[in-house]
Amino acid sequence: MANDSPAKSLVDIDLSSLRDPAGIFELVEVVGNGTYGQVYKGRHVKTGQLAAIKVMDVTEDEEEEIKLEINMLKKYSHHRNIATYYGAFIKKSPPGHDDQLWLVMEFCGAGSITDLVKNTKGNTLKEDWIAYISREILRGLAHLHIHHVIHRDIKGQNVLLTENAEVKLVDFGVSAQLDRTVGRRNTFIGTPYWMAPEVIACDENPDATYDYRSDLWSCGITAIEMAEGAPPLCDMHPMRALFLIPRNPPPRLKSKKWSKKFFSFIEGCLVKNYMQRPSTEQLLKHPFIRDQPNERQVRIQLKDHIDRTRKKRGEKDETEYEYSGSEEEEEEVPEQEGEPSSIVNVPGESTLRRDFLRLQQENKERSEALRRQQLLQEQQLREQEEYKRQLLAERQKRIEQQKEQRRRLEEQQRREREARRQQEREQRRREQEEKRRLEELERRRKEEEERRRAEEEKRRVEREQEYIRRQLEEEQRHLEVLQQQLLQEQAMLLECRWREMEEHRQAERLQRQLQQEQAYLLSLQHDHRRPHPQHSQQPPPPQQERSKPSFHAPEPKAHYEPADRAREVEDRFRKTNHSSPEAQSKQTGRVLEPPVPSRSESFSNGNSESVHPALQRPAEPQVPVRTTSRSPVLSRRDSPLQGSGQQNSQAGQRNSTSIEPRLLWERVEKLVPRPGSGSSSGSSNSGSQPGSHPGSQSGSGERFRVRSSSKSEGSPSQRLENAVKKPEDKKEVFRPLKPADLTALAKELRAVEDVRPPHKVTDYSSSSEESGTTDEEDDDVEQEGADESTSGPEDTRAASSLNLSNGETESVKTMIVHDDVESEPAMTPSKEGTLIVRQTQSASSTLQKHKSSSSFTPFIDPRLLQISPSSGTTVTSVVGFSCDGMRPEAIRQDPTRKGSVVNVNPTNTRPQSDTPEIRKYKKRFNSEILCAALWGVNLLVGTESGLMLLDRSGQGKVYPLINRRRFQQMDVLEGLNVLVTISGKKDKLRVYYLSWLRNKILHNDPEVEKKQGWTTVGDLEGCVHYKVVKYERIKFLVIALKSSVEVYAWAPKPYHKFMAFKSFGELVHKPLLVDLTVEEGQRLKVIYGSCAGFHAVDVDSGSVYDIYLPTHIQCSIKPHAIIILPNTDGMELLVCYEDEGVYVNTYGRITKDVVLQWGEMPTSVAYIRSNQTMGWGEKAIEIRSVETGHLDGVFMHKRAQRLKFLCERNDKVFFASVRSGGSSQVYFMTLGRTSLLSW
């Protein structure tokens, strides 16, 4: 142990007797900070010679430390490798203020080693430069160590260079002398990254000690700093580095380019056990230090480099230097002048030193003369000797007392250490018991949680099995009903054919009777030809007529009865169903199946309450437990009847007043009353003239089934009542064409149920078009040319005016796509539009179509489909526009007029700014767009081959910033002036400076161009994903690597970079997606997704556990997003994977009995600020509520395409589409600031 009491010789230093610096030195500017004061560049007034002046306030508390520093500098600064101490002055202050002490030292104008490394290309010095500087450092340390002084703060900033490339050690503010008897210290002082393990151990263990060899560890770290630009662990937080240095193996040089001598020197300096570390003299004999043949050339190179650096830096970037004195104290030792500096001084320096020595000598002579004069006057020689003997006796007595006191103190400290060790052992025992108790509680809790989770899983499986069983029973009942109806149909068909055969036989029988009667009449005529009197030409006698009643009575009708009856049946049937194919079949004696209309040629037959009450049912609310985007609005592109429209096109070319299908069964969830001028859809069945309203039947875009008619007897309402199921079944049942279609029909019936089951629905009914022809049909239109025919007045009225069941109209929010060509209004119906209506309070409804070349179809709001009728009628969710009787050429439009906008808003009830819009930029990128981030209003775009800036504020120009580097992910942090990226072939985490990127565009700052524009975060490679999380004023960066997760935190000035915070390695499941949540503002948890599910890591304890594992999926999954739900204190999450999403909390418990179900497998899922989530699929873009998972909106694609989410801000969402061939374009969607609340 060292003696911590001040040295007695320091009492002799009288600060008040020092001279005032006024007129001798003047301060020029501040150049740095020392341990106890600021360092100025000063100038000698008379000679102009520069000096370093350390200015300190003299307080009572720090007076002893200042004396120690003066003593240390005075005694040990006279060496060529230590900054020379010139003298001290006192600047008096007014009463009430502390005096200022000026310490004048040698000025080193070339700066520190740290400045030299920073101003060198690549931030690394040559190996022979490092050897020369290390040797000079060791020589200075050897001088200090000989005098038992430990510097304790060796680092690059405390090693300065003169203009002649000489190396000087400075800052004795933390140095101390060793006790000569013990030789070790145990105080915790130094800079973290350069600190030796034994010095760090003193902070944790009071019994730990160290000696002068701790300076040699710091010398080795300084050598690494010169070789690599920074000390090891510099990316870590300082407290983290203090934790790792004693536990990690000794650091080594990373690069293999250095010589074996250099590696050996580093190994010698960095020995963790300081007792085995070589001494200073041994390291000076090391080959790396000893063998320096070209020392003169090295000094010349260093001097030239220093001169070049000073010219570049100029006056504005002066180097900061740190000078200070010692902190510790020691007993008095004989004062030594020390060896004078052996360096060649700059002219003027020797004069300055002689002036100081002369001033000090004069002061000393004057004080000695006064003392001699006083001693001669007051005391005699005998009294002096007596006084000296008394002093010696007292001193001896005092020494004995100090020894006894020290012995007692050491004994007391030993007892205290024993008591402390006992307490620590007891505390460790209690902690182990507490730890075991907590582990037991945790084990029990986990067992209880596992048991509860297993029970919940078992109950869930049972519920699913019960639900599936009920579904199968329901489907079985549906199938039985359909089979029963099929048997009834077949029975009716057989009965019809039997009756036709009876009629045919009756007609043949009547024909034979007629022939017999004709033969009989011929015979009578033959008899009448004979000559008779006039009265003999009367009719035959009555008894003869009565003998043949069956031949004579029906004579006027016998020949015409079958044809007349067929005409009556045809007329009666034409009045009810507007079609007559079956009536024509009566004359041929067989049943014909009418042609099946295509989607663009037919409307469904809406029936009113007055005619067919069996078809009416209350509208059911559409609130599925598992939400999907399937709705009746979305038509099937793969409909088996799609192709039949061209085969039956002849039926569409006939006159609409005479040839329409007899009865159409439409497969939709609800039936709509089709209004017309003066007639309804119900009256078209009951009282209207045949063919009077050919546009009065609505087509939904779903597949149709056509029922064959067998005979003309019976009203249409009776046939409908037999065909439709009971009202309490809550769904329509449709007649199939043939028994082979029963399976498909049962599947279709399940698809249109109002309440969907909570399990996954496998068939997705969305398509690229909502109505009309496909892209292939568009090509047919181009080939046929402009052969168009206009529809009749009824067609125009049906397509341009819509009257709902309660006489009110609807305004529908639409999606508008702005492309290279702006939209133009047109009043003709488009072949690709689908009109969505709902009840509102507007006055009228008109139809307006726009032309566009976009790849998107109108925006669809599913809440428009959930309409409850206000009266006794039913309301449809879909109204298509086409006409049964219209020729196909009349429906097909110009292929350039492909309408993608349906706007039913005649009264302008909503401004255009509230309408969801999609725009795209004309710029096509040659390589695939992988990521993007908003920088101000402009967009930084990262692709497979580089980084570019898309100027959104100007003409849309693209500026290339970085070429030939892949950018996978990026985020702009403008407040920190950085762009965080995962980039390069090795997927490193790089941070680019925004000022450097801005200068690559503007080229207005040549200083910025010379600096390196980016840096890496640690040595991380193979980054998969990262997330920047802001909590209060702390910015965390959580990074997913191939098999680990790293957490970094932003360290402000002077570090100004991300520094390591936590690391979790060797994870069981490899992370693919990562996020960080703060539970209740206290606990940090890392949430990450893998191919097996979602997991959490407690940052404090490092424990890893599962949050949600989708066990119903056997293969690996693809996690899409981790959404931390708002207003839950970071406790509840929505995790999206595959085509599903579940609500869980951070402890793995299901919070909502709802499964978010996408309509198809999304390629990208993102959370947007409007508290919604968006999914990009190949067929559509879906917008869903984050809180409930319900579908809020759908944007359909005209053709399948792959989309990728980029970024979002406020009401704008940016995404990219990738075309075949590699080109990619940027889209942005403007949702409208208020539209999200009013959809």
Curated annotation (Swiss-Prot):
Residues 926-1213 form the CNH domain. Residues 25-289 form the Protein kinase domain. InterPro entries: CNH_dom, Kinase-like_dom_sf, Prot_kinase_dom, Protein_kinase_ATP_BS, Ser/Thr_kinase_AS, STE20_Ser-Thr_kinase. Belongs to the protein kinase superfamily. STE Ser/Thr protein kinase family. STE20 subfamily. Residues 554-574, 663-672, 722-735, 747-762 have a biased composition (Basic and acidic residues). Residues 578-588, 599-610, 707-720, 788-809 have a biased composition (Polar residues). Residues 858-1212 are annotated as: Mediates interaction with RAP2A. The active site is at D153 (proton acceptor). ATP binds at V31, G32, N33, G34, T35, Y36, G37, Q38, V39, K54. It catalyses: L-seryl-[protein] + ATP = O-phospho-L-seryl-[protein] + ADP + H(+); L-threonyl-[protein] + ATP = O-phospho-L-threonyl-[protein] + ADP + H(+). GO terms for biological process: intracellular signal transduction; MAPK cascade; negative regulation of apoptotic process; negative regulation of cell-matrix adhesion; neuron projection morphogenesis; positive regulation of ARF protein signal transduction; positive regulation of cell migration; positive regulation of focal adhesion assembly. Serine/threonine kinase that plays a role in the response to environmental stress and cytokines such as TNF-alpha. Appears to act upstream of the JUN N-terminal pathway. Activator of the Hippo signaling pathway which plays a pivotal role in organ size control and tumor suppression by restricting proliferation and promoting apoptosis. MAP4Ks act in parallel to and are partially redundant with STK3/MST2 and STK4/MST2 in the phosphorylation and activation of LATS1/2, and establish MAP4Ks as components of the expanded Hippo pathway. This is Mitogen-activated protein kinase kinase kinase kinase 4. Keywords: Acetylation, ATP-binding, Cytoplasm, Kinase, Nucleotide-binding, Phosphoprotein, Serine/threonine-protein kinase, Transferase. One of its GO terms (molecular function) is protein serine kinase activity. Residues 306-349, 421-462, 517-811 are annotated as: Disordered. Residues 642-656, 675-701 have a biased composition (Low complexity). GO terms for cellular component: cytoplasm; focal adhesion. The modification N-acetylalanine is found at A2.
